Amino acid sequence: MVDVVSEGIPVQDVEEFTEKYKNRRKQQMMRFIGSTAVTLISCRLAITRAKARHYVPNMFQLNYKPPVVTYKGETGPALVLATGITVGTLSMLVSGSCWIWDISTMKEFREIKGFSSEKVEHPRLANMPLESDSMRNVYERLELLNGKK
């Protein structure tokens, strides 16, 4: 005998759905944590590079001494760090938002935001009759819009 939850859904289906849902949320979390790690590592490297260039004067020396600059040797790593920080921050924003909204693919994003080129209808929800309170509320709002009240 199969255990049945309310509305005739077998417990096995519920357990399978729950397991898939947990794996999906775990994958979304790992994407966010990975992008956070990239951002933090890039920021940490940028800060240590900036501290290495800091000039600390000895007693009776000028407060500012122009640093020795070799543009060829410093431009590439600086560009890589800036790109890492920017891409990491953007990926944190995107993966965090997708984690909050429970979106894993672009197809789901299009369906949720209504950008889908194909019309997706949910027949169970489209033709459901309204209950009496909801129907009365709809008619009252229509009367207000038409100016009858």
Curated annotation (Swiss-Prot):
Organism: Vanderwaltozyma polyspora (strain ATCC 22028 / DSM 70294 / BCRC 21397 / CBS 2163 / NBRC 10782 / NRRL Y-8283 / UCD 57-17)
Gene Ontology CC: membrane; mitochondrion
Protein name as it appears in the record: Altered inheritance of mitochondria protein 11
Keywords: Membrane, Transmembrane, Transmembrane helix
Keyword Transmembrane: yes
Gene name of the encoded protein: AIM11
Subcellular location, record wording: Membrane
Main subcellular location of this protein, as a coarse class: membrane
Membrane topology: Multi-pass membrane protein
Listed transmembrane segments: 29-48, 79-101
